[in-house]
């Protein structure tokens, strides 16, 4: 097995609730991350994760699966358009609430589960 680097970014402050539109203040964070990732060989997976609260009042997203995938795509697009990272090395995935870090029974647990993870694999 090869080594992996996992960068975990909390969604608080990065997206508006129920949206995949990046907040402008979050863009510099993704740009810095992308510039760092461009220095490493290997593949990059951008994963979107949500809590277990269903998406409400959204015509665009029918489920947390849709929302998590769209957030991963939005994050990857930001990195690719603002850095020298090669697009052929980047993949996206949405996992909805299937890989929680914490309980979904508390506000703090749900907040921890809403995140973007960027995984760098040297294979």
Q: What role is predicted for each listed range?
A:
Residues 37, 41-43, 87, 113:
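A general structural motif
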């Amino acid at each position: 097995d090869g080594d992996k680097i996992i960068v975990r970014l909390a969604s608080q402050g990065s997206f508006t609730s129920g949206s995949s539109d990046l907040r402008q203040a979050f863009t510099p964070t993704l740009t810095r991350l992308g510039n760092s990732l461009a220095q490493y060989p290997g593949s990059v997976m951008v994963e979107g994760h949500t809590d277990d609260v269903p998406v409400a009042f959204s015509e665009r997203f029918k489920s947390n699966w849709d929302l998590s995938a769209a957030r991963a795509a939005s994050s990857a697009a930001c990195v690719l358009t603002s850095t020298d990272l090669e697009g052929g090395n980047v993949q996206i995935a949405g996992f909805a609430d299937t890989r929680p870090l914490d309980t979904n029974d508390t506000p703090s647990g749900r907040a921890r589960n809403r995140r973007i993870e960027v995984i760098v694999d040297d294979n």
